[in-house]
């Protein structure tokens, strides 16, 4: 389907600059990606099943933190699909936890981990499972 959109010259100029920086070869693919992004955000709001990664940095010397993180993952095994643990240096570890479940539920799980004493920094990225997204 083709459709037209009216956009100010200033806005389209900024949009084209963004597309160039991101490596898009045409506006159509960028617009499709923007639409998909909005659809994914709507899925999350509606509580549909989502997947995500929680990436955290923590000090493994904090008493019982490693055990607490492992226990939390086992307690929520129905949502935790996998985890990857990396030793960054003598004190700090990076852990990537892959989760799946209703958007609000996995966000809540991430918030609980991020609030754990000893977790220095973290970020949750949630996206669609892809099943409901058109090409």
Residue ranges and their predicted role:
Residues 61-62, 99-106:
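Helix N-cap motif at beta-to-alpha junctions
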